[in-house]
């Protein structure tokens, strides 16, 4: 179906959770039925495999990449790190046949979906499954979570640096100006 699995784990140095390159926030390009109900277009994948899509697919085969890494993605093995943009989920269609591929089982891992309840992992997974059936609709109602929601900040390192060094510098400079 025009997809080749890459060797090793996929890491992303640009779109990751708190500096851990194997905790990836992929770029999501879900349109139509795949994008229904997505609130913030954020999905977290942990220790994901990946694959590449062939450029010459022929006339009847189409592959829609649903989740990809940034161009700063890496396929990491014991011996090498290969930089590139890798596909983490895709839908291939040829005639009446559809194949949906998700490269990471962590997409619906309860440890991730319970801890980060503001992510769209479950919704996108259900949309991808329902996309394979033309006459089925999602009638599920999301339960109200009573747990504390954790805030997921993508670029915490730069914000922390600005607050740790920037705010005291402004206070010190302001104090010296008033003192003089």
Regions found by a protein language model. Name each.
Residues 168-180:
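Alpha-helical transmembrane segments
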């Amino acid at each position: 179906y025009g997809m080749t699995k890459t060797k090793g784990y996929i890491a992303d140095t640009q779109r990751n959770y708190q500096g851990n390159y194997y905790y990836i926030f992929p770029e999501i390009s879900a349109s139509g039925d795949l994008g229904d109900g997505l609130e913030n277009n954020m999905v977290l994948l942990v220790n994901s495999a990946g694959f590449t899509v062939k450029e010459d697919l022929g006339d009847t085969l189409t592959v829609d990449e649903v989740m990809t890494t940034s161009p700063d993605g890496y396929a990491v093995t014991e011996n090498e790190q290969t930089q590139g943009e890798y596909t983490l989920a895709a839908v291939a269609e040829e005639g009446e046949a559809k194949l949906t591929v998700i490269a990471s089982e962590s997409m619906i891992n309860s440890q991730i979906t319970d801890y980060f309840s503001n992510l769209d992992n479950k919704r996108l997974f259900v949309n991808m499954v329902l996309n394979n059936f033309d006459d089925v609709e999602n009638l599920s109602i999301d339960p109200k979570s009573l747990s504390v929601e954790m805030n997921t900040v993508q670029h915490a390192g730069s914000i922390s640096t600005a607050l740790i060094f920037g705010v005291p510098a402004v206070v010190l400079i302001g104090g010296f100006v008033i003192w003089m």
